[in-house]
Swiss-Prot record:
Its EC number is 3.6.1.9. This is dTTP/UTP pyrophosphatase. It comes from the Bacteria. Gene3D superfamilies: 3.90.950.10. GO terms for biological process: nucleotide metabolic process. Its cofactor is a divalent metal cation. The keyword Cytoplasm applies. The active site is at 81 (proton acceptor).
Amino acid sequence: MDHCPRLYLASASPRRRELLTQVGLAHTVLHLPAPPGEDEPQWPGEAAADYVLRTARDKAQRGQIWMREQNLPALPLLAADTTVILDGRVLGKPADRSDAVAMLAALSGTKHEVRTAVVLVHEDRLYEAVSITHVSMRALTAAERERYCDSGEPYGKAGAYGIQGLAGSFISHIDGSYSGVMGLPLFETAELLRRAGIALP
């Protein structure tokens, strides 16, 4: 737990922690019981754009319940969810190696979309924002995809890659938020905090 936390983070993602620390926001991670499965399934007929906001809201709701159950001090609660969207299809976290290889093969040589939804709950009010970034990935050989999976980096990441790691060399161009692709768009997050009356350092 950080000294004098200013908000709760309803996420175990080390990348989101790093990004909050980068902008000087002391926080405490809520270690929420994980829902069944690696990813919340997309509902039949649900648009990919709606999916990412729903899953971020779900995280915020579970965080609120956890805060009440644990009798935690009242602080703002921040939740986020990131997904990769290719041709309208959600690519979440890979279930295993074959899933990761298949995702990388699908993304290879494409321009795809990364959406990160951010939800802030403060004094019973809900604040929301969605970051949309277009990412161009160069064509990857089968050997490159296999080597990348050997590194262990694809697992636990939407779309089976992390832009801040080894996969950074796969990305030829982005149009949007680099921090959003990492998992927490700092500009949008700061705007939510300002709207809620929470001063940044």
